[in-house]
Every structure is written in structure tokens, then in C-alpha cells.
Design a protein with these regions (language model features):
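Long, compositionally biased low-complexity repeat segments characteristic
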Residues: 97-107
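Basic, amphipathic alpha-helical patches used to engage nucleic acids or provide basic targeting signals
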Residues: 110, 118-158
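Basic, glycine-rich
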Residues: 158-175
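Intrinsic disorder/low-complexity segments
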Residues: 106-109, 169
Length: 175
């Protein structure tokens, strides 16, 4: 909608938005709603939606792992005030799966691997930072909101040696 990101968006749709959030909060409803909307709208141009980043299966897995109440903790702020909450959501959503963990990243990656686990958490968010990067105000707001909802959130500092990409080494040296 053209008014997404304005005060009018939520004000004119308050009852419908709150009803949908209550519906999503019911156990199992999130996956059903996601699959229905994915089939109906996948590929339709919409502000803030990058269909090519995530498959229906990756989205459904994330929705199931989060569960209704925690999903509402993520969607509620976006629906009520998109302008303020569109930035800062942590980079990764991770969850326990057989043999380790699975997850989705902001670039659309979907994986399952063994190794890293967060004690006592079945699903968690990770904000990834380089050594010189700092957690900004929008990220701090999201971290606090997600933690209040009972979600585990970690800030992960990554340090790499011999980081090689398409342009060569990150330090400017020869790859």
C-alpha cells in the first residue's frame, strides 16, 4: 500500500491488523496463513518484500519454529509502525533441528548444519557484526523487543583471516 510507512497505514487498518495478529498468534495458524499467501501472492511486487530471497519451505520452517506468539512479537512492531521498525531486525533466524541447527539469513540462505547451539533455546536470532561494526539504535530496539517476547538474541562478532571474496582479500592483498 502507498501509505505503508506512514501513520495512516496502521490508523486506518487498526482493527484488521490487530485481528490478524491475534489469528497469527493462535498455534498453527501462522504456517497456514503463510502458505496461503505465498501461493496467492508470490511474485507480486510489494514494498519490503523480496520473494526471491526465501523459498516457501524456508519461510514455513521459520514460522513453525517461532510459533504464533513469538511470530507476533516480530510482525506486530512492523505492522504497527513500519517506518520505525523496518530497520535493525537481526541478520539471522536460527533453530534447533535434528543433528544441529537450521536457519535463514537476510540474503535468503537456508541451511541445516551441526555444531553451534544456544543452551536452552529452540529458536534464536543473531545479529552479526564485524570487529569495527557496532550495534545501532534500531538494532538495540529490536533486540530489546525480541528479548521481552522471550526470544534468545545474540550479537555475534565475526573475525576472519584470509577473507576472500569476488574482489580478492578483504585487506586489499592478493588472494
Amino acid at each position: 500500500p502507498l501509505d505503508l510507512g506512514t501513520d495512516a497505514f496502521y490508523a486506518t487498518r487498526r482493527d484488521a491488523i490487530e485481528a490478524r495478529l491475534r489469528q497469527i498468534g493462535e498455534e498453527g495458524a501462522g504456517e497456514r496463513i503463510l502458505r496461503e499467501h505465498d501461493r496467492r501472492f508470490r511474485g507480486v511486487l510489494a514494498r519490503g518484500v523480496a520473494w526471491e530471497r526465501f523459498s516457501e519451505e524456508a519461510l514455513a520452517e521459520g514460522v513453525v519454529r517461532l510459533g504464533g506468539k513469538r511470530l507476533v512479537a516480530v510482525l506486530g512492531p512492523l505492522a504497527r509502525d513500519y517506518r520505525s521498525w523496518r530497520r535493525g531486525l537481526p541478520d539471522l533466524l536460527l533453530w534447533r533441528s535434528e543433528g544441529g541447527f537450521g536457519g535463514v539469513g537476510c540474503g535468503g540462505e537456508y541451511w541445516a548444519a551441526g555444531g553451534y547451539e544456544v543452551p536452552g533455546a529452540d529458536v534464536w536470532f543473531a545479529e552479526v557484526k564485524s570487529p569495527r561494526d557496532r550495534v545501532g539504535p534500531h538494532q538495540k530496539a529490536w533486540i530489546a523487543t525480541l528479548r521481552r517476547a522471550g526470544l534468545w538474541v545474540e550479537v555475534c562478532r565475526v573475525v576472519g583471516e584470509d577473507c576472500v571474496g569476488a574482489e580478492g582479500r578483504a585487506d586489499g592483498g592478493e588472494g
